[in-house]
UniProtKB/Swiss-Prot annotation:
Name the UniProt record assigns to this protein: Prostaglandin E2 receptor EP3 subtype
Similarity comment text for this entry: Belongs to the G-protein coupled receptor 1 family.
Transmembrane portions of the chain: 53-77, 91-111, 131-152, 175-196, 227-252, 283-306, 327-348
GO CC terms: plasma membrane
Any one GO MF annotation of this record: prostaglandin E receptor activity
Principal localisation: membrane
InterPro entries cross-referenced by the UniProt entry: EP3_rcpt_1 (IPR003304), GPCR_Rhodpsn (IPR000276), GPCR_Rhodpsn_7TM (IPR017452), Prostanoid_rcpt (IPR008365), Prostglndn_DP_rcpt (IPR001244), Prostglndn_EP3_rcpt (IPR000265)
Extracellular side, ranges: 1-52, 112-130, 197-226, 307-326
Chain positions carrying an annotated carbohydrate: N17, N35, N216, N307
Residues in the Cytoplasmic compartment per record: 78-90, 153-174, 253-282, 349-417
The keyword ATP-binding belongs to this UniProt entry's keyword annotation: no
Matching PROSITE patterns: G_PROTEIN_RECEP_F1_2
Name of the gene this protein is made from: PTGER3
């Protein structure tokens, strides 16, 4: 009897152009040897779309984070104030974390797409899968915790300026950032020690934390470890989001209260109003980006844990296929956060964009005039350059200093630096 092809049960990639159709095909044939239905032939368009998507995300993330690291590093070398350097360290560490995380994972996905092979064929030992899952866990949680640390720093600077001015030093910032990274790394190594498991995820092009019972070779202890590790990851991620939201809201409240305390409509009062508005908008933007990118994945992981399911069932294309597709979208949203971070925190700030426009106008004006504009162009370039950017960071973080003998907050502004 001649075998036929069932296009109705075609893999996810064939229908939605997300993955190569041959990745799971061989495994389904092994699981159902009596089924005469053959998997659909590989689609070149499907593979090209997947590769283009992965390469676009990797290149975009690399460019944005590399630009942020360059600006921050130059600014850091020019700054003398310790409190100014603390916030620059946080920004630079976040950009470096996002960039390294993408560079370690995206090439693996691209190679797998281009090879048109199953993961097990390229990684028979499973070590690459463990490395991939560990990398996603480390750099994913690190980004969330660094964002939380930055939110805590902003809240302390505005609500406890005296304590912040006397205790917050560059060495403390370095220790906190290094401690965060080491703690997350230790947590991510738990599956290597037997607590939890990194498994191949739908549609077979990446590895991540297993959220439910493993394969046929897992016992009850391993299943318990999977549940514990996946639950801990989701709870830690959601806790980081809650801390970030709470601290950002506290910062906004402190700024609004300080703005209202200005009794007169002086220039200082107008400046405070502008700073408060711009900062509140940016902090709300940060909260929106974090919630949209991370909440779907973390909440869905908890849902799958409570339902005792995992993406292992996606291989058979059951009635839960929509859940598999949504899980893939949730992971891609989390990956998108690594691309958006440098733009939300730094590159799309109004002040920086205005300075770039001034620089462009300065170059254009200098082409048509002589002599008298050289000093002006040079001054604009210097203002645009990193020294002015560092002052802007102080506005962004709302670093404060307590004046000796006075009980009010003193805010560094661009005009007074």
């Amino acid at each position: 009897m001649k075998a036929t092809r069932d296009h109705a049960s075609a893999p996810f990639c064939t229908r939605f152009n997300h993955s190569d159709p041959g990745i799971w095909a061989a495994e389904r044939a092994v699981e159902a040897p009596n089924n005469l239905t053959l998997p659909p032939e590989p689609s070149e368009d499907c593979g090209s779309v997947s590769v283009a998507f992965s390469m676009t995300m990797m290149i975009t993330g690399f460019v944005g984070n590399a630009l942020a690291i360059t600006l921050v590093s130059k600014s850091y070398r020019r700054r003398e104030g310790k409190r100014k350097k603390s916030f620059l360290l946080c920004i630079g560490w976040l950009a470096l974390t996002d960039m390294v995380g993408q560079l370690l994972t995206s090439p693996v996905v691209i190679v797998l797409y281009l090879s048109h092979q199953r993961w097990e064929q390229l990684d028979p030992s499973g070590r690459l899968c463990t490395f991939f899952g560990l990398t996603m866990t480390v750099f994913g949680l690190s980004s969330l915790f660094i964002a939380s640390a930055m939110a805590v720093e902003r809240a302390l600077a505005t609500r406890a300026p005296h304590w912040y001015s006397s205790h917050m030093k560059t060495s403390v910032t370095r220790a906190v950032l290094l401690g965060v990274w080491l703690a997350v790394l230790a947590f991510a190594l738990l599956p290597v020690l037997g607590v939890g498991q990194y498994t191949i995820q739908w549609p077979g092009t990446w590895c991540f934390i297993s959220t439910g019972p493993g394969g046929n070779g897992t016992n009850s202890r391993q299943n318990w470890g999977n549940v514990f590790f996946a639950s801990a990851f989701a709870i830690l991620g959601l806790s980081a989001l809650v801390v970030t939201f709470a601290c950002n809201l506290a910062t906004i409240k402190a700024l609004v209260s300080r703005c209202r305390a200005k009794a007169t409509a002086s220039q200082s009062s107008a400046q405070w109003g502008r700073i408060t508005t711009e900062t509140a908008i940016q902090l709300m933007g940060i909260m929106c980006v974090l919630s949209v990118c991370w909440s779907p994945l973390l909440i869905m992981m908890l849902k799958m844990i409570f339902n005792h399911t995992s993406v292992e069932h996606c291989k058979t294309y059951t009635e839960n296929q929509d859940e598999c597709n949504f899980f893939l979208i949730a992971v891609r949203l989390a990956s998108l956060n690594q691309i958006l971070d440098p733009w939300v925190y730094l590159l799309l700030r109004k002040i920086l964009l205005q300075k770039f426009c001034q620089l462009l106008k300065g170059h254009s004006y200098g082409l048509d005039t002589e002599g008298g504009t050289e000093n002006k162009d040079k001054e604009m370039k210097e203002n645009l350059y990193i020294s002015n950017l560092s002052r802007f960071f102080i506005l962004l973080g709302h670093f404060t200093e307590a004046r000796r003998g006075r009980g009010h907050i003193y805010l560094h502004t661009l005009e007074h630096q």
